[in-house]
């Protein structure tokens, strides 16, 4: 098995793509000693194409709850009784202060994230004003995650300083309807393509541990590759009480590590970003940075707590890695 891993690794260094069947073979055969061989190879691929730099980003839940969509994993959906805090669009000062604070702590990217399929025109204008002010007053890269937007809206975001748009595919096309029925996979892809057309970089990934198969995960990784996604966040399902996935069995550690490694093999030049659910991984995902990951969301998530920024920075430095500042 080690020879197969090395052969595929060499293919990637020669700018050849791993095939779907090769990815399946790597995942299914990587146990015990072979697991370490797989993780080591993914780490070398990460180093070859991305160096030892780790990108830290942070997010702000800028509008919480009351979402019309039925995503089975989500605490913010109106379809489920999850007892989360609900509020309308945050104000300028709160967003500006958090962006400043995160920059001072060493964060490279900052994003507003809003609930709902799309923002109202009024809320979208508020978001534009907030981004315009942050861009003027804080030296930090700006990202946005505001749902399904048109090309013109995405162009407006770019014009006020946003450089990257986040919009997850969540899972494979085949499994998607088991997770969401209120909007389509193609609507998500259209938003991604509109963002690229507007000149924005794109951050798009998914959630693992929702009952999908290994094949679904690998199909997602190849879909992201076909879309030339620059930043791929991998979330681990943190089952929320009141949602349909409340009683879903949590993934084993090795399953998470293998998934990250395979995503690195399939997308060697992308940023593989640890996202929600890091608290379910040993040491807040420390081992993932030896399995191909080279980016992470630091601080709190949307409705759950994350790792402290200073703790993340210490962890990254302890691994001999550097921060992208």
UniProtKB/Swiss-Prot annotation:
It catalyses: (4R,5S)-dethiobiotin + (sulfur carrier)-SH + 2 reduced [2Fe-2S]-[ferredoxin] + 2 S-adenosyl-L-methionine = (sulfur carrier)-H + biotin + 2 5'-deoxyadenosine + 2 L-methionine + 2 oxidized [2Fe-2S]-[ferredoxin]. GO terms for molecular function: 2 iron, 2 sulfur cluster binding; 4 iron, 4 sulfur cluster binding; biotin synthase activity; iron ion binding. Pfam families: BATS, Radical_SAM. InterPro entries: Aldolase_TIM, BATS_dom, Biotin_synth/BioAB, Biotin_synthase, Elp3/MiaA/NifB-like_rSAM, rSAM. Gene3D superfamilies: Aldolase class I. Keywords: 2Fe-2S, 4Fe-4S, Biotin biosynthesis, Iron, Iron-sulfur, Metal-binding, S-adenosyl-L-methionine, Transferase. CDD domains: Radical_SAM (cd01335). Its EC number is 2.8.1.6. [2Fe-2S] cluster binds at residues 111, 143, 203, 273. SUPFAM superfamilies: Radical SAM enzymes (SSF102114). It comes from the Bacteria. Signal peptide: none annotated. Residues 49-278 form the Radical SAM core domain. Pathway: Cofactor biosynthesis; biotin biosynthesis; biotin from 7,8-diaminononanoate: step 2/2. [4Fe-4S] cluster binds at residues 67, 71, 74. One of its GO terms (biological process) is biotin biosynthetic process. Binds 1 [4Fe-4S] cluster. The cluster is coordinated with 3 cysteines and an exchangeable S-adenosyl-L-methionine. It is an enzyme of class 2 (transferase). Its cofactor is [4Fe-4S] cluster; [2Fe-2S] cluster. Belongs to the radical SAM superfamily. Biotin synthase family. Catalyzes the conversion of dethiobiotin (DTB) to biotin by the insertion of a sulfur atom into dethiobiotin via a radical-based mechanism. Homodimer. This is Biotin synthase. It comes from Clostridium tetani (strain Massachusetts / E88). The lineage of its organism: Bacteria, Bacillati, Bacillota, Clostridia, Eubacteriales.
